[in-house]
């Protein structure tokens, strides 16, 4: 019986991917105005369908809560009128961005007279595998459409109802613009085997992008025959250098940890220069503790905070290098900038790292030596985001260096081909 089910699912997923491949062919040369019209129509459809989308999302949230998911997880899953309006606004913003397809990135003339250009082209069919983030359904579909790619969207089972409801609104936009319905498809089953069947279709799917926790990333990378671009965990550090202004240190630590603790660019570890720890840790720790953050500290940091009357607990060995996605922060006092760089090299996840300092030499060295997709100087880790960096919406933040590194906007969803023109040239 299981074998029959597997064969049926395999055929179903192949059929879905074949439809995506056909849609990608049409999208590769679609009129940019038609793509933009589809995005604007989808934004309007989301507004009209708000009640249904929120109703389906409420069912998802209720089921996840009953299953024992934590508050940060539920926050990522939850939609409300404000967030839904933000999703619609994102569609309009993407519609207003410059279309990358056909952009000439370089051109030159060879001594033999050959004219050569490099131009951007779509990747083809993109499989997006993600967890409980309904907004990713729309962001990924929109970015893929704008960049001429077909999207296969595989949300986690907890977000399936929400994603299907959002996909209905997106499909309405496609239909109004006369674009293929298969340009953006949500995998309609929660069966995990469906993902594995799709990952085997390297003849139809050009790229897989997993976005979620370590277990999801590993499962996709290990099972995929399709090239994988990983959006791995964000173990983001904030380092307070010896010259860090105390109030700025407080502001950046609070923003990085508290604003949205359940996202990948939230700060997960605070490093403090030993020479300034006595001055910086008490006000920073107090502000974080007052905001409900549990501080898990190394012995030196714990002693300083306890003396200042700030609630803190000893760190466990695995707290360093951990993505908490919650109001929990690992805290360590380091000897100096070298110590901070060594710690980040050992525990960082290539995502986002930040320094607070008045010392230009320290700032430049931190920028030069830290290995991450974004390095912040006197700015919160929360700024590693496509919208905040001026890229428009993003499909995720890549921690894979090949092809794309950091927030993936429209340009990162294209590749390039050579156009060569001659006059009967032979070699």
Swiss-Prot record:
Subcellular location: Cytoplasm
GO cellular component: cytoplasm
Class of this enzyme: oxidoreductase
UniProt entry keywords in alphabetical sequence: Amino-acid biosynthesis, Cytoplasm, NADP, Oxidoreductase, Proline biosynthesis
Tree of life domain: Bacteria
PROSITE patterns: PROA
Pfam families: Aldedh
Pathway the protein takes part in: Amino-acid biosynthesis; L-proline biosynthesis; L-glutamate 5-semialdehyde from L-glutamate: step 2/2
Catalytic activity: L-glutamate 5-semialdehyde + phosphate + NADP(+) = L-glutamyl 5-phosphate + NADPH + H(+)
SUPFAM superfamilies in the cross-refs: ALDH-like
Function field: Catalyzes the NADPH-dependent reduction of L-glutamate 5-phosphate into L-glutamate 5-semialdehyde and phosphate. The product spontaneously undergoes cyclization to form 1-pyrroline-5-carboxylate.
Protein name from the UniProt record: Gamma-glutamyl phosphate reductase
Lineage: Bacteria, Pseudomonadati, Myxococcota, Myxococcia, Myxococcales
């Amino acid at each position: 019986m299981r074998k029959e089910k597997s064969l049926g699912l395999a055929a179903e997923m192949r059929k879905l991917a074949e439809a995506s491949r056909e849609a990608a062919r049409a999208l590769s040369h679609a009129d940019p105005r038609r793509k933009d019209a589809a995005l604007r129509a989808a934004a309007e459809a989301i507004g009209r369908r708000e009640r249904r989308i929120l109703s389906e999302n409420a069912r998802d949230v209720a089921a996840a809560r009953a299953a024992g998911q934590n508050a940060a997880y539920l926050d990522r899953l939850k939609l409300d009128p404000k967030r839904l309006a933000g999703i619609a606004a994102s569609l309009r913003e993407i519609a207003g961005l410059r279309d990358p397809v056909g952009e000439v990135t370089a051109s030159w003339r060879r001594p033999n007279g050959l004219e050569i250009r490099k131009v951007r082209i779509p990747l083809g069919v993109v499989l997006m595998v993600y967890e409980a983030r309904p907004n990713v359904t729309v962001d990924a579909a929109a970015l893929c459409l704008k960049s001429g790619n077909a999207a296969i969207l595989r949300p986690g089972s907890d977000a399936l109802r929400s994603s299907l409801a959002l996909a209905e609104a997106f499909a309405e936009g496609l239909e109004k613009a006369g674009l293929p319905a298969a340009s953006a498809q949500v995998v309609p089953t929660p069966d995990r085997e469906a993902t594995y069947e799709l990952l085997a279709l390297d003849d139809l799917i050009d790229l897989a992008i997993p976005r979620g926790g370590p277990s999801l990333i590993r499962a996709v990378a290990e099972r995929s025959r399709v090239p994988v671009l990983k959006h791995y965990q964000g173990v983001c550090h904030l380092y307070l250098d010896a010259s860090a202004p105390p109030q700025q240190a407080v502001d950046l630590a609070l923003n990085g940890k508290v604003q949205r603790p359940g996202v990948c660019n939230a700060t997960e570890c605070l490093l403090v220069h030993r020479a300034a720890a006595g001055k910086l840790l008490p006000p920073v720790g107090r502000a974080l503790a007052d905001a409900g953050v549990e501080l898990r500290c190394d012995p030196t940091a714990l002693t300083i905070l306890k003396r200042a009357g700030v609630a803190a607990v000893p760190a466990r060995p695995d707290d360093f290098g951990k993505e908490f996605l919650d109001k929990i922060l690992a805290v360590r006092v380091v000897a100096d900038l070298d110590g901070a760089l060594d710690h980040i090299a050992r525990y960082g996840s290539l995502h986002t790292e930040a320094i607070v300092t008045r010392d230009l030499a320290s700032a430049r060295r931190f920028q030069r030596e830290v290995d991450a997709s974004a390095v912040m100087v006197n700015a919160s880790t929360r700024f590693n985001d496509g919208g905040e960096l001026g890229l428009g919406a993003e499909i995720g933040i890549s921690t894979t260096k090949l092809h794309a590194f950091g927030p993936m906007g429209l340009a990162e969803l294209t590749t390039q081909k050579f156009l060569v023109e001659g006059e009967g040239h032979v070699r």
